[in-house]
Each structure stands twice: as C-alpha cells, then as structure tokens.
Amino acid sequence: MEVALAHPALKAFMCGSLSGTCSTLLFQPLDLVKTRLQTLQNNMHPGAPKVGMITVLFNVIRTEKLLGLWKGVSPSFMRCIPGVGIYFSTFYSLKQHYFQEGSPSAGEAVLLGAGARCVAGVAMLPFTVIKTRFESGRYNYISVAGALKSVCQNEGPKALYSGLTATLLRDAPFSGIYVMFYSQAKKALPQEISSSSIAPLVNFGCGVVAGILASLATQPADVIKTHMQVSPALYPKTSDAMRHVYVKHGLSGFFRGAVPRSLRRTLMAAMAWTVYEQLMARMGLKS
C-alpha cells in the first residue's frame, strides 16, 4: 500500500535499484576480468605475449577460486543499487518535466541520458573508486568501510574522486548514446510487437545493440579511468594516464578489456532497462 502511494520518482528509484541489483550480481565477473586486463598492462614487459580475457578468467579461478570472480561485488552493490536507482529516478524526473507531451528526439535522448548519468556518477564515484581497487587485486582491503577509511587516512578524501573527469567522459556519453539508440530502436518497432507478450525480449535485443555501440565509443575513457583510480599517485591528471597508455601500448592500449566490458555493460544495461520498464509498467507508470 505504501509503495502504491509513493511519489513516481521514488517508484522509479525503487524499480531502478532492483534492476541494478539483478544485473550487478549476474555480470560482476566480467567487470573484474575487464579491470584485471586493463591493470595488467602496467606489469607487462615490452614484447611480452598478450594476455587475453579467457587467460585472466581461468587465472582468477585457479588462484582465488570461483568466488574470486565476485571480488568487489560488495562495493559494486553499494554503488549500483543506489546508483542505478538515482539514475532512473533522475531520468524519469527529467523526462516528465521536459517531455511530458511527447517522446524526445535522438539529440534530446542523448542529453537526457547523459544528464541523468552525470548526477548518478558524481554521487556514487567514491564507491566506484573502491570497487575498482577491490577488483584490481592490488589492495588488501577487508571491507568497503575499511577501504573508505584507509583511502581517507592515507591519501585524503580527494582520492575518492580520482578519475572523476574520465568517469564522466565515459559514463555520460555511454548513457546518452545508449538511450538514443535504445529509444530510436524501440520507436522503429511495429506497434503489434511493442504491445505483445514478447515485447520484453525484443526490448532486451534493442538494448544489446545499443549497448555494443555505446561501449565501443566510450572504451578509451574507461581505460583511462581505471588507471587513474588504481594508481592515483602515478596518474593525477587525465592527460597523464592518456600519455602513459599511448606511449607504452599505442592506440590499441585504449581498447584493452573492450570485450569483457562490452559484454558486461551491454548485458547489464539491457537487463536493467528491461527489468525497470517491466516494473514501472506493473506500477502503472510510463517509463
């Protein structure tokens, strides 16, 4: 009863948080493999054979057991559950305020998605930093609270916002591009499909296509963000991380970890949007 009486933006927050919980739990291993691939670059000697996604995956299972693939899931939950909720509630509020009478155009969809992601990204960045460090395997943090305390004591609170520029350069365009492709793909669907029982499956397919395109476009920013958050002392500025990656690995270094990241971001976004839209429909709200 209390849920039914809640403000629509709060309902959007709850639907988003639940969808974020499901997608984070399922796809955390891909995020861990992506982080390990990107941070492995710094330990590789020139001419050393390239390490692929499958090699990293089996190495983690061998040295850290199967559950090692979910290392960093606690900060991921602390970031994604409220973070996805904030994103969808902000998205819903902006859409209702500016586009109540009709659907946004392709350009407006980019701004809508990017704006909502900026709000969520800034709010949850400290947990993004901790999550990245957990996954890198370089830090012996026991808990999220302990990690936050350690960073504040040893590096200062400013370190919790390391990689802010790179994070926003990665997440805002990803969300904007994703929302644009996703909304345009759904618009192109025949009405009989949109209102049929297979609509969730079709929407998921639209989300997968949108996610792949958005992931590839923002991969370089993700590599830079990871370097800055794992080693903030070495790369205090975005330009420092960019220079290091380019000098040591060339242009291909900016696409290290692209496969696991694209898989994870694409599947997470597609699932989150599909679950969110179904939950919102159950509550009688248009997402």
Curated annotation (Swiss-Prot):
GO biological process terms on file: erythrocyte differentiation; glycine import into mitochondrion; hemoglobin biosynthetic process; hemoglobin metabolic process
Repeat region (Solcar), residues: 7-97, 104-188, 198-282
Residues passing through the membrane, by range: 13-38, 72-98, 110-135, 163-186, 202-228, 257-275
Annotated tissue distribution: At 24 hours post-fertilization, expressed predominantly in posterior blood island, posterior cardinal vein and circulating blood. At 34 hours post-fertilization, becomes restricted to posterior blood island and circulating blood.
Pfam families per record: Mito_carr (PF00153)
Mode of membrane association: Multi-pass membrane protein
Keyword Membrane assigned: yes
HAMAP family: SLC25A38
Role of this protein: Mitochondrial glycine transporter that imports glycine into the mitochondrial matrix. Plays an important role in providing glycine for the first enzymatic step in heme biosynthesis, the condensation of glycine with succinyl-CoA to produce 5-aminolevulinate (ALA) in the mitochondrial matrix. Required during erythropoiesis. May play a role as pro-apoptotic protein that induces caspase-dependent apoptosis.
Protein name (Swiss-Prot/TrEMBL): Mitochondrial glycine transporter B
Gene name, Swiss-Prot/TrEMBL: slc25a38b
